Design a protein with these regions (language model features):
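Short, acidic loop-to-helix structural element flanking the phosphoryl-transfer center
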Residues: 58-86, 91-97
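Hydrophobic anchor at the start of a short beta-strand
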Residues: 83-84, 109, 148
Length: 190
């Protein structure tokens, strides 16, 4: 199967980093449990951009700690022959640091894409399953005929309750939900 996997808030917990940057730079608290939709309304666009830039610098990227079971799950899927496309809204300039981080933590990948239009790239690559936290990306992928899954967060919980999205609280649960699908759809990487 051809699998696309997001990074921030999917392979590792990103919200704490973003929230820390907002508090340090602007004195604005961004409580995780209160982030009930995809828009971050407590920050102006320029403030959000600065916080994202800070959290996507090389030092911050290389310090990222993956979620428990994320690395082992993705590595197992890759070893089973699944194509792994890692995708992120990170700026293209973050590609090198992101590739080093993935190698450093042990996540194998066949393709890495850092740009904003993830779903178009997924369609271009023939991706069959997208794992992402963004409700916008999940819905666009469903519209494109791509299966979707997510780690549950406050901003995507409602989508999990209403749409055909495979959801789990953590990577262990996500792997349990996806493994039978992946066994049925196994295909050697092209």
């Amino acid at each position: 199967m051809r699998i696309a996997i997001d990074i921030d808030s999917t392979l590792h917990h990103y919200w704490d980093r973003l929230s820390d940057a907002a508090l340090r730079r602007f004195g604005i608290d961004l409580p995780y449990e209160e982030q009930l939709d995809w828009g971050i309304t407590r920050l102006r666009h320029d403030q959000l951009h600065l916080c994202i830039k800070e959290t996507h610098c090389e030092k911050a990227i290389l310090a990222g700690e993956p979620y428990p079971d994320a690395v082992d799950t993705v590595a197992r899927w890759h070893a089973e022959g699944h194509f792994i496309h890692v995708t992120s809204h990170r700026d293209p300039d973050a590609w090198d640091a992101t590739a080093r981080w993935l190698t450093q933590i042990g996540v194998p990948f066949d393709d890495l894409y850092c740009a904003h239009d993830k779903v178009s790239r997924c369609v271009e690559l023939g991706i069959e399953l997208l794992i992402d936290d963004s409700p916008e990306n999940l819905l666009r992928a469903v519209d494109a005929g791509i299966l979707v899954a997510t780690i549950v967060h406050p901003w995507n919980r409602e989508l999990c309750e209403e749409e055909d999205v495979m959801c789990a609280d953590d990577w262990r649960g996500l792997a349990a939900k996806l493994d039978s699908l992946l066994r049925r759809r196994a295909r050697v990487r092209p």
